[in-house]
Structures are given as structure tokens and as C-alpha cells.
Design a protein with these regions (language model features):
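Short secondary-structure transition hinges
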Residues: 73, 80-119, 123-127, 148-152, ...
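Hydrophobic alpha-helical connector segments
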Residues: 44, 58-87, 124, 135-139, ...
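Amphipathic alpha-helical packing segments from all-alpha helical-bundle domains
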Residues: 51-54, 101-126, 133-138, 145, ...
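Short amphipathic alpha-helical elements of helix-turn-helix/winged-helix folds
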Residues: 2-6, 81, 142
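Helix-turn-helix
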Residues: 2, 6-40, 44
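Short alpha-helical scaffolding segments that buttress acidic/His motifs in well-ordered protein cores
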Residues: 78, 92-93, 139, 172
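Alpha-helical DNA-contacting segments of helix-turn-helix folds
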Residues: 40-49, 56, 106-107
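Short, charged helix-capping/linker segments at alpha-helix termini
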Residues: 13-14, 126-130
């Protein structure tokens, strides 16, 4: 959690292992006993955050009765996670991370895992697995970009996030219902 906060505040390139060690209350050699490099620490952190996001979505849709409810519950879970876990969201989806091939690869792994989950919820008769996967990436992109904008406005829990998530879910649902094979 300490590394998460430091990376969220300063970004990957603005963060040093000295700062992480100091914030954690350990020496740099102790930190290097656990992580071979700043990149290794960051990758492990991104993997853990991706697992948390995926878990939040899966748990969020677990009690949904049908496809439309799954879409809405999924967006609500995503928005709740993004607003509750602001530093984690910033580490995962900071736009500058995409410019670096190493960081982008770690983040693409998270997006792929989430898209795989979302693809399993898309039920369109006659749609191939590849087509379902492409649509899932569209849904993930919609969630990520709208959440980033929402958080960029300084909005969060209690400021209409649930209503906004419902609107984005409606947008996604309407789009998915328009898909025909």
C-alpha cells in the first residue's frame, strides 16, 4: 500500500526506490531483497491492482439476474472501485504509462484479464469469440475513459457516481443490444 501511494502521487518515473523504502520505513537494501528493481515492484503492484479490480467487477455482477443487470452492475462496480481506490486507478490507468512499452505491457495484461471477464458476459447470438472479445475491449475502454474523466473532474463517491455509472451502463447496454450477427 505504501508503494501504491508513492507511485500514485509521483508516477513511475518520478518515484525512486529510496522514496518507497523511506515511506515504508525500511532501508533500500531491504526493499531490494523483495524486488529486484523499481520496474519489478511496479509490475507486481499493477498485477495486484488488476486482480483487485477484476475481483470487484466479478463480485459486483455476481447477483445480477440477467445480461442488462450484469452490464449495470459491472459499471457500478467499476465506478465504485475507481472512486474508492483512486490511487490504484491512477497507477493502473495514468495516460503517461501508455507511452512506455514496459509499463504499457503490464497495464495491457490487466486490461486483457478484465476484457476476458467482460467477454464472458456478452451474449449475442452468432457472435464469434473474437468478436465478443473486441466488444469486451470496447466496454472496458468505455469504463476506463469515463472513469478517468469523472475522477479528473474531482468527483467521487456521493457526487452522483451511481447515477453516472447508470448512464454509462445504459450507453453500453444500448450499444451492445444494437449488435447483430
Amino acid at each position: 500500500e505504501v508503494a501504491l501511494q508513492v507511485f500514485a502521487d509521483k508516477g513511475f518515473y518520478g518515484t525512486s526506490m529510496n522514496e518507497v523504502a523511506e515511506a515504508a520505513g525500511v532501508t533500500k537494501p531491504v526493499l531490494y531483497q523483495h524486488f529486484t528493481s523499481k520496474e519489478a515492484l511496479y509490475r507486481e503492484l499493477v498485477d495486484e491492482l488488476g486482480t483487485r479490480l477484476e475481483r470487484a467487477i466479478v463480485e459486483g455482477v455476481a447477483d445480477a439476474d440477467g445480461p442488462r443487470q450484469q452490464v449495470e452492475a459491472g459499471f457500478h462496480a467499476y465506478f465504485r472501485w475507481a472512486t474508492r481506490e483512486g490511487p490504484a486507478f491512477r497507477v493502473l490507468f495514468a495516460e503517461h504509462n501508455r507511452a512506455d512499452p514496459v509499463l504499457a505491457t503490464a497495464i495491457e495484461k490487466v486490461e486483457s484479464a478484465v476484457a476476458d471477464r467482460v467477454a464472458g458476459f456478452i451474449e449475442v447470438e452468432g457472435l464469434s469469440d473474437d468478436e465478443r472479445q473486441v466488444l469486451a475491449y470496447g466496454v472496458v475502454g468505455l469504463a476506463e475513459s469515463t472513469s478517468r474523466h469523472w475522477l479528473g473532474l474531482g468527483l467521487g463517491p456521493g457526487t452522483g457516481a451511481d447515477a453516472f455509472a447508470a448512464q454509462v451502463a445504459q450507453l453500453a447496454w444500448s450499444g451492445l443490444r444494437g449488435v447483430r450477427r
